[in-house]
Amino acid sequence: MRYTTSFIGLCFLIFLLKNLVNGGLIRECDYTMEGYGPCGPNGRSLCLDTFWKTPPSPGLSKNLEGCRCEDRGKRPPIFTGLSHTCRCCWSYGGGSDD
């Protein structure tokens, strides 16, 4: 049993090192999107909807880690109403897409 556990641990380490050498997991943060209206109680889902409508880089398999909604107040005088900003973080596998 001891050798089996060691073998599984060794395989996991090889897998981990292989991913790190080939680019591994790339984490991007602060993808910023602006939108109309205040955040309100459903600000997180508002940002998630916006994120999936305009993904940062199409063609990559992304794992969204989270979004944060921030009220910006009034827009410039040309526009009317309130606005918000969404900041999102996501991760994706890198290295082999080029």
UniProtKB/Swiss-Prot annotation:
Disulfide bond entries: 29-89, 39-69, 47-86, 67-88
Domain of life: Eukaryota
Keyword hit for Disulfide bond: yes
Single biological process term from Gene Ontology: killing of cells of another organism
InterPro entries attached to this UniProt entry: SCRL (IPR010682)
GO cellular component entries: extracellular region
Subcellular location: Secreted
Signal peptide interval: 1-23
Main location: secreted
Keyword match Protein transport: no
Keywords from the UniProt entry: Antimicrobial, Disulfide bond, Fungicide, Plant defense, Secreted, Signal
Family from the record: Belongs to the DEFL family.
Full protein name: Putative defensin-like protein 239
Source organism per UniProt: Arabidopsis thaliana
